[in-house]
Amino acid sequence: MIGRIAGILLEKNPPHLLVDCNGVGYEIDVPMSTFYNLPQTGERVVLLTQQIVREDAHLLYGFLTPQERTTFRELLKITGIGARMALAVLSGMSVQELAQAVTMQDAARLTRLPGIGKKTAERLLLELKGKLGADLGALAGAASPSDHAADILNALVALGYSEKEGLAAIKNVPAGTGVSDGIKLALKALSKA
């Protein structure tokens, strides 16, 4: 399975990307939340990926954050939710907004997304309840320990720490802390653990 792609961003046409990795071009679909945060074409990009193998195609879906990929995987487990709909959900709301909607059981918020009707929204709420985890919920809204929690977590994961270790370390980073200071504080917390 392809879990990560690092290379040069050659093309970006929503929601499709073409990333050159040592002479091989990978076509990757991304949610709009990832698309809007991509570098310019010709620059280096690192994406966490989910590979889906079907009878007629091998598809790659890319994400900038571990939370987006984890949420995408949870959405795929729900009956009737395919990769396109999971991308539509992540394109229409952030992981934090989705976690908040699930926590508050807010079906109306989900029905505003394209392709999500009342029954699908209720199924999403029912099946995601408790599955997004306290970790994703901790990054939602006012409960966020740092304004840059996602960036700090990405850096820790890139340094080889697990997502769980990173989330635990981020709890030691006060709100309003910058990314580089936040990484230092999180690393300090990890060294004590």
From Swiss-Prot:
CDD domains: UBA_RuvA_C. InterPro entries: DNA_helicase_Holl-junc_RuvA_I (IPR013849), Hlx-hairpin-Hlx_DNA-bd_motif (IPR003583), NA-bd_OB-fold (IPR012340), RuvA (IPR000085), RuvA_2-like (IPR010994), RuvA_C (IPR011114), RuvA_C_sf (IPR036267). One of its GO terms (molecular function) is four-way junction helicase activity. Keywords: Cytoplasm, DNA damage, DNA recombination, DNA repair, DNA-binding. NCBIfam families: ruvA. Belongs to the RuvA family. Has three domains with a flexible linker between the domains II and III and assumes an 'L' shape. Domain III is highly mobile and contacts RuvB. This is Holliday junction branch migration complex subunit RuvA. Residues 1-64 are annotated as: Domain I. One of its GO terms (cellular component) is Holliday junction helicase complex.
